[in-house]
Curated annotation (Swiss-Prot):
It holds the Pfam family QueF. Catalyzes the NADPH-dependent reduction of 7-cyano-7-deazaguanine (preQ0) to 7-aminomethyl-7-deazaguanine (preQ1). GO terms for molecular function: preQ1 synthase activity. It comes from Psychromonas ingrahamii (strain DSM 17664 / CCUG 51855 / 37). HAMAP family: QueF_type2 (MF_00817). It is found in: Cytoplasm. This is NADPH-dependent 7-cyano-7-deazaguanine reductase. Belongs to the GTP cyclohydrolase I family. QueF type 2 subfamily. It is an enzyme of class 1 (oxidoreductase). Pathway: tRNA modification; tRNA-queuosine biosynthesis.
Length: 285
């Protein structure tokens, strides 16, 4: 049994290519990109776009991108895309994959030309300036595996008998001890809002405030296991629930989802402005 949010029948979602038989085009086609309004889940969370309680970014890693140079020779590249937290739309991932595939048989004079096109198209889809960085020198580009820092919640030996999302697990979340600490878990699993395909993630929670009850926090994270929502929406829900139930001075929630279709999505939400985000590839990515 899956758990869907109230907005899952919104007409915007019914027009997405997700869950439908689609044509894989190999000629450049920016119309393949599809947007999902961030307001869908934010309205349910009672968030105002004019006064959001967080900052952050959706960091995408591209592993499958290719085009033809002016002589018709294929070029391959990896890339990093950063979508601002306050863009009007998030970018639907299957449409992003189909869009990238449309570059396969299209000619571009340079990597800079491709980067310019990607930046323009993704910014248009998100309705906010998006940054794009591409790499073609794959033999001289470092992309080492890393690990989260802090204390792992997964060592807790707890019994679980319910897998339906339940924020009430966070009742009385904070003690009276003031701390600054980082906690993480590899047990976050949610499901695609449209197809119910499993989405796997590791999540890092860094905060300053009254100490959080680790067992309650882990039980809450596991309760996403049958919940249907997009990656970005899950992270915002987790951020808001921790802020609601905990006595928190500052908070950063950073999830790194496993790769699908040559893309991984890594949403980060934080109480503070950020200039840089650690694009740390984990083992399952």
């Amino acid at each position: 049994m899956t758990n869907k949010p109230l907005y899952d029948q919104d007409s915007t979602l019914k027009n997405l290519s997700l869950g439908k038989i689609t044509e894989y085009k190999s000629s450049y086609d920016p119309t393949l990109l599809q947007a999902v309004p961030r307001s869908l889940n934010r309205n349910e969370l009672q968030l105002s776009e004019h006064n959001l309680p967080f900052y952050g970014v959706d960091l995408w890693n591209i592993y499958e991108l290719s085009w033809l140079n002016s002589k018709g020779k294929p070029v391959v590249a990896t890339g990093v895309v950063k979508v601002p937290f306050d863009s009007k739309n998030l970018i639907e991932s299957k449409s992003f994959k189909l869009y990238l595939n449309s570059f396969n048989q299209s000619k571009f004079v340079s990597i800079e030309a491709v980067q310019k096109v990607l930046t323009a198209d993704l910014s248009h889809c998100a309705d906010k300036a998006v940054s794009v960085e591409l790499h073609t020198d794959l033999d001289n580009f470092s992309d080492k595996l890393g690990t989260f820092s802090g204390q792992c919640l997964d060592v807790l030996d707890i019994e679980i008998d319910n897998y339906q999302l339940n924020a009430d697990y966070l009742q009385d979340l904070s003690s009276q001890e003031q701390v600054t600490e980082t906690l993480y878990s590899h047990l976050l699993k949610s499901n695609c809002l449209i197809t119910s395909q499993p989405d796997w993630a590791s999540i890092e929670i860094s905060y300053t405030g009254k100490k959080l009850d680790r067992e309650k926090l882990l039980r809450y994270l596991i309760s996403f296991r049958q919940h249907n929502e997009f990656h970005e929406q899950c992270v915002e829900r987790i951020y808001c629930d921790i802020m609601k139930f905990g006595q928190i001075d500052s908070l950063c929630v950073y999830a790194r989802y496993t790769r699908r279709g040559g893309l991984d999505i890594n949403p980060l939400r934080t109480t503070e402005h950020i200039n840089e985000i650690n694009n740390l590839r984990l083992l399952r990515q």
